[in-house]
């Protein structure tokens, strides 16, 4: 389902809620929400998600965690994607990307993926299954899990969009 944000720079919980009514949720195990906009605003708002997974393509540079700390600090998992291109992209260092993430005091796991070459896909699927099982157990116990939302997000958002 594609959600139109109108003139907003990111999704909000109301938009996601309305879109979920278009789905038969009892038939789904996992719903992915891909937010829009830059790497600052989306991390600052609760969409009702249980986890934040941040994708970092090797074509974007290993410095992204340092440049966009709000997004990466909120991550429960960082996926390094398109890793099959590491053979031809000599200025991306996976270890440097992880080091930049750790500089943010993040303990989120880091996985390397290449959908094209099927590298790391089993590990990614296993992680998703573990998270799904953990969420099912939390739900059974009447608990939930809140995502890591940056507390200064609304202030930062207002400053970025001030006239």
Question: Where does each model-flagged region fall?
Answer:
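Amphipathic alpha-helical transducer elements in NTP-driven molecular machines
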Residues: 10-13, 17, 33, 65, ...
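Nucleotide-state-sensitive switch-loop elements of NTP-binding domains
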Residues: 1-50, 72
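Canonical P-loop GTPase G-domain recognition
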Residues: 85-142
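Cofactor-binding loop segments of dinucleotide-utilizing enzymes, especially the Rossmann-like FAD-
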Residues: 5, 57-58, 115
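Conserved C-terminal guanine-recognition region of P-loop GTPase G domains, centered on the G4
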Residues: 38-108
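Conserved beta-strand scaffold positions in the cores of enzyme catalytic domains, especially
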Residues: 2, 52, 110-112
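A short, charged, Gly/Pro-tolerant segment at domain boundaries
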Residues: 139-163
């Amino acid at each position: 389902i594609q959600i139109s944000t109108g003139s907003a720079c990111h999704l909000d919980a109301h938009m996601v809620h309305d879109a979920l009514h278009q789905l038969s949720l009892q038939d789904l195990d996992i719903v992915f929400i891909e937010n829009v906009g830059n790497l600052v605003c989306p991390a600052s708002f609760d969409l009702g998600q249980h986890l934040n997974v941040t994708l970092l393509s090797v074509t974007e540079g290993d410095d992204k965690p340092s440049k966009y700390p709000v997004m990466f600090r909120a991550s429960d998992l960082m996926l390094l994607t398109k890793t099959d291109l590491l053979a031809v992209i000599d200025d991306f260092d996976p270890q440097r990307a992880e080091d930049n993430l750790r500089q943010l005091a993040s303990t989120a796991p880091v996985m390397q993926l290449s959908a094209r070459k099927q590298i790391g896909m089993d590990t990614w699927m296993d992680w998703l299954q573990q998270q799904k099982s953990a969420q099912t157990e939390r739900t059974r116990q009447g608990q939930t899990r809140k995502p890591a939302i940056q507390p200064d997000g609304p202030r930062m958002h207002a400053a970025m969009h001030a006239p």
